[in-house]
Amino acid sequence: MRIHCLQHLKNDTLGSIGTWIDDKEYKLTKTLLYENSFFPAPEEFDLLLIMGGTMSIYQEEEYSWLKPEKEFVSKVIEAGKPVLGSCFGAQMISEVLGGKVTKNPYKEIGWHTVRSIEENIEQSPSELTDSKLPSCMFPEFTGFMWHGDTFEIPAGAVKLFESEACPNQGFIYNGNVLGLQFHPEANRQWVRNLIRDSGHDLVSGKYIQSEKEILGQESFFDSSRNLTFSLMNWFEEKCGQEN
């Protein structure tokens, strides 16, 4: 299995996703957007990962690589490749598919409950049954958040998840393109790096937890790792179906 990653931050270790890739000994290639905007042809990889970032999707003037990255992601989706977008990555998928990305009413930072949208699942049985997303994602789980923007659910996609602070937490498109507002990659070291680099965001807020609250949740780190491994196994199956 060949995995290509769009990385926006120098210190992004890929967290639990990186651990899963290492354990599987799969080939991993990267486009480091902060250094260059070289993109491979879609046929050169099986799965695309679009990671998070401190920038916003609509800051094309500040980040010259954003427009070509969006064009690349659109090309990959059109080619039918499986795609996983985390936080900023999910927002990118939404915009590429015609959705809008705007400021969320609240900043959401820390561990928060994510709930599945049962009525959407009931109304779209073929889309979701065929996709067979990990059962640990239903009916709810605890996800790690660090965001101030939010995405629309794009046309043709099915809304999957919501949280108290953010109505749109996840969607699936074409059965193999998954956009998640939370960070499935969040393990302890990944979170420590984020706090070190962006700790200034940890101000008083209704949905903003303190460093102590975030790092003191050992069970959440464990359950997040299990969810991420199940999710990556799901993508592994999807890639096998494509090949």
Task: Kindly give the residue locations of the regions a language model identified.
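Short glycine-/acidic-enriched loop or helix-start segments at secondary-structure transitions
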Residues: 14-16, 59-61, 94-96, 155, ...
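Conserved beta-strand segments of alpha/beta enzyme cores
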Residues: 27-29, 100, 142, 158
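Conserved beta-strand termini and adjacent loop/short-helix elements that scaffold enzyme active sites
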Residues: 6, 31-33, 104, 146, ...
